[in-house]
Amino acid sequence: RLAPEDYPAERLPELADFYRNAFVEMRSERGFNEPLYEGARDTVERLADEGWLLGVATGKARRGLDIVFEHHDLHRYFQTFQTVDHGPGKPHPRMVLDAMGETGVRAEQTVMIGDTSWDMLMARAANAHALGVSWGFHTPGEIEEGGAHAVHHQFDALNAWLDAFEPGPAKGDPA
C-alpha cells in the first residue's frame, strides 16, 4: 500500500523484507517509540473496566508485541496473546480459535477488530464478528472484501458499535 504505484510487483517481497529488517533494527534502538493510535488506549481501558475479555491476534512475533505492550503498559488489560510464533498466521483462524479456547468464549461472543483483510478472513473463518478499522494497513475496500461485517473510520463509531453489541451469530452468518 505504501510502495510507489510504479514500483515493480516482482520486487515487492524484497522491499517488504528490507522494511521488516529496518524496522527490527530501529525498534532495538534506545528510546524507540511505536505510538498507539489516538483513542486506542482509552478504548482498551474502557472495555477492560466494563469486563470485556481482551485478546490480541497479531502477525507480530511475541517479542515485538511484548516490546510495544511493555512500553505502553498494556499487558494487564489482556487475557490472551496470540502471535505467529505458535502456529499458522493470518488468515488461518487458529489464533482466534486459540484465544477463544483460552478464555472460554464462544464464537458468537467474539469480536475481532482489525485493520487488514486478513484479519477479517481470520475472524470469519472462526465464525467471529469481523470489525474493520480504516486507520491501519489495508484500505476500507480491501477490508470489506475480506468480509468485514462493518468498517469504522473513527474510535467513536467503533465504540458505539461495541456499546450496542449483543452476542449472537455475526450479521449475515447462519444462526
Region locations from a protein language model:
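Asp-based, Mg2+/Mn2+-dependent phosphohydrolase catalytic module
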Residues: 10, 46-48, 52, 61-175
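N-terminal helical cap/lid subdomain that shapes the substrate entry/recognition surface
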Residues: 1-52
